[in-house]
Amino acid sequence: MFSYRHAFHAGNHADVLKHTVLLAVLRHMTQKEAALNVFDTHAGAGLYRLDGDYAKTSAEAADGFLKLVATQPKEPYAPALKDYIDMVAGFNTTNHWSVYPGSPFIIQSLLSGRDKLKLWEMHPTDIKTLTSNIAQLEAGRQVAILREDGFE
């Protein structure tokens, strides 16, 4: 098994793009009354510390999310990008930017009571962390976590 740990890469430039698009798509999809079933095939731990050892080891967030929020744009941010920054800000009590939500937390924060979220993760440590993190949401049966290959 390839042992990918997203905690080393949380908040990098790819996350900025991926999570901005994810948030915009989900905002659009949740405008309808129909229930959603959302799948995350590589959920990781779901929530990350940008001031933690893993993030500091790679320092990828410094060139991604942290660089974005440290920059004073000449023009206002595009609405989708502003929405993304505001979403991450909602997980932090100050502008210290220590907590970074992964896709599972971004998705779950937008779901209604009729929607479902299914998360797959194979890394033994990350699935334990993911399970603990998701338990804090008290989402009950709305969120299912599977220790399986999300592509199978």
Pin down the residues of each PLM region.
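Class I SAM-dependent methyltransferase Rossmann-like catalytic core
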Residues: M1-E33, R49-D63
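Class I S-adenosyl-L-methionine-dependent methyltransferase module
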Residues: L36, A45-E152
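Conserved beta-strand/loop positions that form the S-adenosyl-L-methionine
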Residues: F39-T41
